[in-house]
Amino acid sequence: MAKISITLKKSLIGRKKDHIATVNALGLKKIGRTVEHEDTPQIRGMIKKVDYLLEVK
């Protein structure tokens, strides 16, 4: 399966608690950090929920 790179581009300060939890579940803690995940429907759903905070390649 393909890999996707996810980078946190915006701060989590003042965001909804469930959005913060979703970003943390993706493995992102600080702005500018990048992680790689398998391209699965579960990961895509998490990305869609907080897409305004992320950059996906």
Curated annotation (Swiss-Prot):
Keyword terms of this UniProt record: Ribonucleoprotein, Ribosomal protein
A GO CC annotation given for this chain: cytosolic large ribosomal subunit
Disulfide bridge positions per record: none
Any GO molecular function: structural constituent of ribosome
Alphabetical list of InterPro entries matching this protein: Ribo_uL30_ferredoxin-like_sf (IPR036919), Ribosomal_uL30_bac-type (IPR005996), Ribosomal_uL30_ferredoxin-like (IPR016082)
Stated family: Belongs to the universal ribosomal protein uL30 family.
Gene3D superfamilies: Ribosomal protein L30, ferredoxin-like fold domain
Complexes and interactors: Part of the 50S ribosomal subunit.
Pfam families, per database record: Ribosomal_L30 (PF00327)
Protein name: Large ribosomal subunit protein uL30
Family matches, as HAMAP family: Ribosomal_uL30_B
Organism: Clostridium acetobutylicum (strain ATCC 824 / DSM 792 / JCM 1419 / IAM 19013 / LMG 5710 / NBRC 13948 / NRRL B-527 / VKM B-1787 / 2291 / W)
